[in-house]
Regions:
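N-terminal helical cap/lid subdomain that shapes the substrate entry/recognition surface
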Residues: 2-103
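Asp-based, Mg2+/Mn2+-dependent phosphohydrolase catalytic module
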Residues: 1-7, 20, 110, 121, ...
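Catalytic-core regions built around general acid/base machinery
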Residues: 104-115
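Short, well-ordered coil loops that connect the C-terminus of an alpha-helix to the N-terminus
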Residues: 35, 80, 114, 170-171
Length: 244
């Protein structure tokens, strides 16, 4: 029996390479609308976007306003006459078309799904996240999909975790692990909900001040945290997997 019975996953920066997807989607957007000063615009967009998502996590802005306002602010700075809502829809469509999966994710989820309940907990745009996970072939491994805009609560609020565990029928929080790359949203959020946490430090940053239960540098390390030795011994052997 796995040590953790329920695994809650963030999406961007944890399962999917958001940086690669964002860069490609922005490039398509710049090309489509013929925007100049692209490197400078991309840098400013990312700064504005990060500040607004931080505001979302603090409960200061709603997602539907955020996704348009980031382009309004960008176009104002660069004196661009363009419809922010229209550009945002084009950008989200390009982003949704990307399924940049971190190496080995599908195999890892397949093994973990045999020993635990898996679910997604994300602050991202629901239609974008669902399509990207579908295209990546990952949706089938999850028993639940919990997005902040639908639940009405944003990570790091414990309310989104409470809603997820309630719907999944999970009562013992000691057996739940929140897995993500955001110290503020995922690690602090998981702790707010009384959960063990796993910090995905895929960029190799200094994690000495991150107060997570576990820290990993590649997702495959998660199997050593979740699985018992007997289960680890049967990884890749479907005939013996259910004999443990």
């Amino acid at each position: 029996m796995a040590y953790y019975h329920c695994l809650l996953f963030d999406v961007d920066g944890t399962l999917l390479d958001f940086n690669a997807s964002e860069k490609a989607a922005l490039s398509e957007m710049f090309e489509h609308y013929g925007f100049d000063r692209r490197e400078e615009m991309q840098r400013r967009y990312q700064e504005i976007n990060a500040s607004l998502w931080a505001a979302l996590e603090r409960g200061e802005i709603k997602q539907d306003k955020l996704v348009v306002q980031r382009f309004e602010m960008l176009f104002h700075e660069f004196d661009i006459q363009a419809k922010a809502a229209e550009v945002n829809e084009f950008y989200l469509a390009q982003l949704a078309a990307r399924a940049d999966v971190f190496e080995g994710v599908q195999d890892i989820l397949q093994e973990l799904a045999e020993v635990a309940t898996l679910a997604v907990v994300t602050n991202g745009v629901e239609r974008v996240q669902r399509k990207r996970l579908d295209q990546a072939g990952l949706t089938k491994y999850f028993d639940g999909f919990f997005v902040s805009s639908k639940v009405g609560a944003t990570k790091p609020s414990r309310k989104i975790f409470d809603a997820a565990l309630r719907e999944l029928g999970v009562e013992n929080r000691e057996k739940v692990l929140m897995i993500g790359d955001s110290v503020k949203a995922d690690i602090a959020g998981g702790k707010n909900a009384g959960l063990a946490t796993c910090f995905c430090n895929f960029s190799g940053q200094d994690a000495s001040t991150v107060k997570a239960t576990h820290t990993i540098e590649h997702l495959h390390e998660l199997m050593n945290i979740v699985m018992e030795p007997e289960e680890l011994a049967n990884v890749g052997n479907p005939e013996k997997r259910h004999q443990v």
